[in-house]
Amino acid sequence: MSDKKEDCFVIMPISDCEGYNQGHFSRVYEDIIKPSVFNADFNPVRGDEVSKTNLIQLDILNKLLEAPIAICDLSSRNPNVLFELGIRQAFDKPVVLIQEKG
């Protein structure tokens, strides 16, 4: 039996968004999401960390479909985030939805 953890794909903005301080989503990922995912015995993977080919869209699509679980941060209503969430839902894949309070 392998000790390799399964991936948890993290759907969230990977760059700064209007209305948020610079680096906000990087801090959320590094300080909140990653430790929580590790604690749940999964390996966190964000869209900018999946480069297997030269086509990042294909890499993200594969991870969206292959990851046994995903976390989606809806705080910014980012169009790419909502699109990726729609793909997970269209294929009936489990997703944990999170959003900042306020």
Mark where each language-model region is:
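Short glycine-/polar-rich loops that comprise or flank the Walker A/P-loop
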Residues: E6, E66-I69, F91-V95
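Anion (oxyanion) recognition and catalysis
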Residues: F38, L65, Q89
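Conserved N-terminal substructure of TIR/SEFIR domains
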Residues: M1-T53
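TIR-domain catalytic/interaction hotspot
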Residues: V45-C72, S76-E84
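Conserved beta-strand segments of the P-loop GTPase G domain that flank and frequently precede/overlap
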Residues: I11, C72-D73, I98-Q99
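General N-terminal targeting signals
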Residues: F25-R27, L61-K63, Q99-E100
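A generic "cationic amphipathic patch" detector
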Residues: N21-G23, Q57, F83-E84, K101
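Cross-kingdom TIR/SEFIR domain
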Residues: S76-G102
